[in-house]
Amino acid sequence: KVPDGKGGSGTEPRFIFDVYIQSQADAWQVIKDIAAGFNGMTFWGNNTFNVVSDMPADTTKLQILTRASVVGKPNYSSGSEKNRYSSALINFSDPDNHYQDRTTAVMFPDLVKQFKFKQTQLTAIGCTRESEAQRRGGWAVYSNYLDRLITLQTGLDGFAYVPGTVFAFADERFSGRVY
């Protein structure tokens, strides 16, 4: 449960996927669209189709990798500031308007100060609540902002990880901080 966005102490489910598929489409694309409805990710691995969801991780139980676990050197990267957003317009299906698309917006003043006003637009597939659409827009903006990426290769201990696995990485080049 998450706050319902109306103030007070009301809560609602984090995601409700409320969709009616009305046309034929490529199965892989339909599954990817469904996974997008809960911030999921699809991938093909080990000769099976896999879906993982974006869920909060218990940071006290994360596996910590160190440079000793890495073959070669880790490579850090992130996107350009030119591609940073400070707000989002989100289309969602409004049940009060016969499920016609309606647009809602989110904006983050701290990011506007840092990157100026840059807007992205997205469609929240299967979303029928404005509060959920705003959360999805906020997730899109902040995940775009917090995009430090590390690329690394491991030995056999790397078999424990699949795409979407959350882990910590301790690198002495960052003064012993864990990222």
Predicted feature locations:
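C-terminal extracytoplasmic interaction modules
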Residues: K1-Y179
